[in-house]
Amino acid sequence: MSKTEVRLRQPIVVVLGHVDHGKTTLLDKIRGTAVVKKEPGEMTQEVGASFVPSSVIEKVAQPLKGIIPVKLEIPGLLFIDTPGHELFSNLRRRGGSVADIAILVVDITEGFQKQTIESIEILKDKKVPFLVAANKIDRIPGWRPIENETFTKSFRSQSQSVQKALDNYVYKLVMQLAEMGFNAERFDRVRDFTRYVSIVPVSGKTGEGLPELLALLAGLTQQYLKTRLRAVEGPAKGVILEVKEEQGLGHTIDVIIYDGILRKSDTIVLGGINGVIVTKIRNILLPAPLQDMRMTRSGYRSIDEISAAAGVKISAPGLEEALAGSPLYVANDEAKLQEARKLIEEELSKVRFSKNSTGIVVKADSLGSLESLVAGFEKIGIPVRVADIGPITKRDLIEAELSAKEVEEYGIIAAFRVKPIPGLDTSKVKIIYNDIIYQLIDDTIKYIEDLRERRKRRTLDSLVLPGKIKILPGYVFRRSDPAIVGVEVLGGVVRPKYPLIREDGQRVGEVLAIQDNKKNIERATKGMEVSMSIKGNIMIGRQVQEGDVLYTDVPQEDLEILFKNYKDSITEDMMEVIKELIKIKKAENPLYGIFIQ
């Protein structure tokens, strides 16, 4: 490299994708390949990340020289060790993400699933470029695996039918990406990498396609992200991935440094549960090599300084309340300290808030997850009253109860990886727990929708009540469309819009209207003989015969509400109908009416 050339830092790479699509397997294979190909002293294990040096990438990509020219200016690639949404949400920086590029892992045989689509939405929102690893090619029927081979060579050795099957799978991914607004193509058919998302068929299990994946990651980042990757000599900037208590070290923070140089003598500024934390670094730590483990009781070795991009553990006083997802700035003079303090205060107030308005309470364990949850709820129109970090407190319960007084379904707490403080009575407030961001949002939506639905059905008139009728022989006025018949009510209640079933549980239609002495009536009870029109899948003489007995089709939820809120309204004859209904409905739902003693 000439003196005029700019030094580049290593790009930070994250791995996202749907559960069970092979994110961890692929990451493990990349790390394993790097270990096998490295020379002594070439590879450094970092905290929360794995650095794959350019020398290793060049060796792995050697067979592709004729197809992908690989002459790397970047020092290598820094892979964040933990894949998935939850950790990615903590890789926050102003205007986007600390991640420079992402690998979106998709099971080639399954295509896009819910979390795949969510991953793309997140990457789009954070403006992170990505390429698609179409994983599990070894699962394509008839695929003959060749361990650690390039995709190009392995693909050529497959039968024509297998090649065609793979192309069809890739085409489906192309179509799914097009639906989300992206041009995409298999990597070896892409001419303009700025306009097309590259799809790299790989196997995390056999290592096939890994050379192309690594070569593309390295090549694309150094070609198109040069300005972003320009190495900065100034004070370090980073983001806190995790806060941990380590034996012999106390509270520590795992940090990704994405800019500048971090030194052991530095003063750092970061976000804490109760505001900004200013502290002086005690130690910058990296994992000790295996042979040095005996020398360090903690399993870490101390270093004097490190340049971006890097994953390190920092030991310092006062880190007990440090927040995962918080920015971290080096500030060694008063002016820098005030500037950093202001930036972090702005970040904290943007994500943590309390409004005097109706909405749910959201509690999370980190700034990143809290930010993702609030954005997720607001996107689907669920307002947030309180967004905060840490365990659930009495104040949170009070806020939820205040919300419930205004809008019943908003009197809840959505809790991500946090629990109530010990001894807190939470019995009066619904708390929804989940350790997966998208699942917590889904669970909350379901609870709110169910509550709204239940509220609609609270009045007795809105319920389908138990009823039993008999079609009177000789009183068929019209056989179908709608059928009009004379009926006797044998028990319970029948109303217009009530669905009807036969004694075998088969749905036959819905009551359209009821007449008594040629006048429309809203209900018919035991002992009444009325004329009834029934619409739906019914023809007298085919699905239903004269003399047949029909029942109202009472949903399980309506029966529960009837017993819970309106038990006094249940007459003896209605109770008999309920018992008969339970016998009929249990054939398809063994739990139907289980709550009735």
UniProtKB/Swiss-Prot annotation:
Residues 17-24 are annotated as: G1. Residues 81-84 are annotated as: G3. GO terms for cellular component: cytoplasm. CDD domains: aeIF5B_II, IF2_aeIF5B_IV, IF2_eIF5B. The keyword Protein biosynthesis applies. Residues 203-205 are annotated as: G5. Keywords: GTP-binding, Initiation factor, Nucleotide-binding, Protein biosynthesis. GTP binds at residues 17-24, 81-85, 135-138. Residues 8-225 form the tr-type G domain. Residues 135-138 are annotated as: G4. InterPro entries: EFTU-type (IPR029459), P-loop_NTPase (IPR027417), Small_GTP-bd (IPR005225), T_Tr_GTP-bd_dom (IPR000795), TF_aIF-2_arc (IPR004544), TIF_IF2 (IPR015760), TIF_IF2_dom3 (IPR023115), TIF_IF2_dom3_sf (IPR036925). It holds the Pfam family GTP_EFTU. Residues 42-46 are annotated as: G2. GO terms for molecular function: GTP binding; GTPase activity; translation initiation factor activity. It comes from the Archaea. The keyword GTP-binding applies. Belongs to the TRAFAC class translation factor GTPase superfamily. Classic translation factor GTPase family. IF-2 subfamily. Function in general translation initiation by promoting the binding of the formylmethionine-tRNA to ribosomes. Seems to function along with eIF-2. This is Probable translation initiation factor IF-2. It comes from Metallosphaera sedula (strain ATCC 51363 / DSM 5348 / JCM 9185 / NBRC 15509 / TH2). The lineage of its organism: Archaea, Thermoproteota, Thermoprotei, Sulfolobales, Sulfolobaceae. The gene is infB.
